[in-house]
Regions:
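Fe(II)/2-oxoglutarate oxygenase catalytic core
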Residues: 1-102, 110-137
C-alpha cells in the first residue's frame, strides 16, 4: 500500500516507539504495512480558515452497523503550519505538529478530540483511518 511519504514516516516512527515501550511489540505489524490485513479509508484533505473549528468527537462509532464502527487507528497529517490556533486537542493535551508530521492515535471512545478554532492563516490536514479486514464497505 502506498500512501503519502509523511504518513509512511509517521507509521514507521509509531512502530519504533512501540518497540521502545516493550520489545514484544515488534511482532505487531504497523497498520496498513506489509503482512497486515487492515485497510485504509480514502485520505481526506481538510482546510480550516479563521474562526473555523471542529468540535469534540471520536472517530469510531459505537453503532455496529456504522462504517466508522470498525475504525482502529486515526491519522492526522499536518500539511501546513503557518496558522495560529487550530491545535488538535485531546482531553488532557493538545498538539500542533509542524508541517509534514502526523498525529497517530486509537480511533475509539477513549480518545475524544477536537480541532480548536483557527485564529489566523489556513490550517490544512490530511486525515485517514485504518480499520480491520472483516468489514464490507
Amino acid at each position: 500500500m502506498v500512501i503519502h511519504k509523511g504518513m509512511n514516516n509517521a507509521l514507521l516512527e509509531y512502530h519504533q516507539r512501540l518497540i521502545k515501550i516493550h520489545p514484544s511489540f515488534d511482532g505487531y505489524p504497523v497498520p496498513g504495512g506489509f503482512m497486515t490485513e487492515s485497510n485504509r479509508e480514502l485520505i481526506q484533505v481538510l482546510e480550516y480558515v479563521s474562526n473555523q473549528k471542529y468540535n469534540f468527537h471520536v472517530d469510531a462509532s459505537t453503532v455496529p452497523s456504522a462504517k466508522e464502527y470498525h475504525r482502529k487507528i486515526s491519522i492526522i497529517l499536518y500539511l501546513s503550519d503557518d496558522f495560529e490556533g487550530g491545535t488538535t486537542k485531546f482531553v488532557h493535551q493538545e498538539f500542533k505538529p509542524p508541517m509534514g508530521h502526523a498525529l497517530i492515535f486509537p480511533s475509539n471512545w477513549c480518545f475524544p478530540h477536537c480541532g480548536t478554532q483557527v485564529t489566523s492563516g489556513k490550517k490544512r490536514v490530511a486525515v485517514t483511518w485504518y480499520y480491520v479486514h472483516d468489514i464490507n464497505i
